[in-house]
Amino acid sequence: MXFLXFXLXLLXMXXMXXXDSSEEKFLRRLRRFDEGRYGPYQPFAPQPLYPQPYQPYQPQY
């Protein structure tokens, strides 16, 4: 879902046709989004895959 929105935003950036102020604004918004995603504040952080109960591979003989 996030990847889809990112691709849409990239499409919009390609269509913008080089207006400097809007490009800078877009880049600032992207940077803020990344800070929110990987910084201390994660409102929509997904559930961690680990720790999970570790199940070693046991072949069926």
From Swiss-Prot:
Gene Ontology cellular component terms for the protein in this record: extracellular region
Disulfide linkage: none
Pfam family, one: Statherin
Residue ranges, annotated region (Hydrophobic): 37-61
Superkingdom of this protein's organism: Eukaryota
Coiled coil: none
Region (Hydroxyapatite-binding): 20-25
Location of region: Disordered: 37-61
Compartmental location: Secreted
Modified residues (Phosphoserine): 21-22
Sequence ranges of Pro residues compositional bias: 43-61
Tissue distribution of the protein: Secreted by parotid and submandibular glands.
Signal peptide stretch: 1-19
Keywords recorded for this protein, A-Z: Biomineralization, Phosphoprotein, Secreted, Signal
GO MF annotation: an example: hydroxyapatite binding
GO biological process, one term: defense response to bacterium
Family: Belongs to the histatin/statherin family.
Protein's job: Salivary protein that stabilizes saliva supersaturated with calcium salts by inhibiting the precipitation of calcium phosphate salts. It also modulates hydroxyapatite crystal formation on the tooth surface.
Protein name: Statherin
Protein species of origin: Macaca fascicularis
